[in-house]
Amino acid sequence: MLCFLRGMAFVPFLLVTWSSAAFIISYVVAVLSGHVNPFLPYISDTGTTPPESGIFGFMINFSAFLGAATMYTRYKIVQKQNQTCYFSTPVFNLVSLVLGLVGCFGMGIVANFQELAVPVVHDGGALLAFVCGVVYTLLQSIISYKSCPQWNSLSTCHIRMVISAVSCAAVIPMIVCASLISITKLEWNPREKDYVYHVVSAICEWTVAFGFIFYFLTFIQDFQSVTLRISTEINGDI
């Protein structure tokens, strides 16, 4: 049986595949339409101009929903594990969830407010998504170590921490270099003064984005043992 069909494993699997498709499809359409330079555009650049803006907005909105669903399920898993065998304060898990949901909210802002139309709002959403997302992965990595070896293998903990560390190392120069760019534009010339800042921040942005994707990929095994039950109760007369 396919691993992503067991339990709730389809949730992080769908998040990973859908988000990857969102980035790749938007990039391909934007490049083929001649709206961006094929060499290292910002992720948001590939979702600014129609028709790719519609594709980007729709797919990133759904990615934000899947991200929230994955994080909430992860929160409930850790909560249940902690009740069975105490390894961490519940507040730590709750803070991680709140930061993760704030990051998903930031993704929604990025999806619905294009960078050239409302750059301040768009950039604010991107900052929320990336910073809160990186902190979320760091906190979840710490939780993973605390629950090892009862609930996680040491290799899984190491993988999560490496991804978190790389994402953390990339998000700082991404923000710094992006803040040094004096103008927001889609096409860049290597001779322009801010071109180096653009390239560095774009590399870091793609690194962090796919760092998130690979991180959620590690959740699939944890979600295989989770079952979702929905109960319906009708109160009062109809």
UniProtKB/Swiss-Prot annotation:
It is found in: Lysosome membrane. Keywords: Apoptosis, Autophagy, Lysosome, Membrane, Transmembrane, Transmembrane helix. InterPro entries: DRAM/TMEM150_Autophagy_Mod, Frag1/DRAM/Sfk1. It comes from the Eukaryota. Its main location: membrane. Disulfide bonds: none annotated. One of its GO terms (cellular component) is lysosome. The keyword Nuclease does not apply. It is a multi-pass membrane protein. Induction: By p53/TP53 and p73/TP73. Directly activated by p53/TP53. Significantly down-regulated in tumor cell lines by methylation-dependent transcriptional silencing. GO terms for biological process: apoptotic process; autophagy; cellular response to oxygen-glucose deprivation; regulation of autophagy. The chain crosses the membrane at residues 9-29, 53-73, 91-111, 116-136, 161-181, 200-220. The keyword Membrane applies. Lysosomal modulator of autophagy that plays a central role in p53/TP53-mediated apoptosis. Not involved in p73/TP73-mediated autophagy. Belongs to the DRAM/TMEM150 family. This is DNA damage-regulated autophagy modulator protein 1. It comes from Homo sapiens (Human). The lineage of its organism: Eukaryota, Metazoa, Chordata, Craniata, Vertebrata.
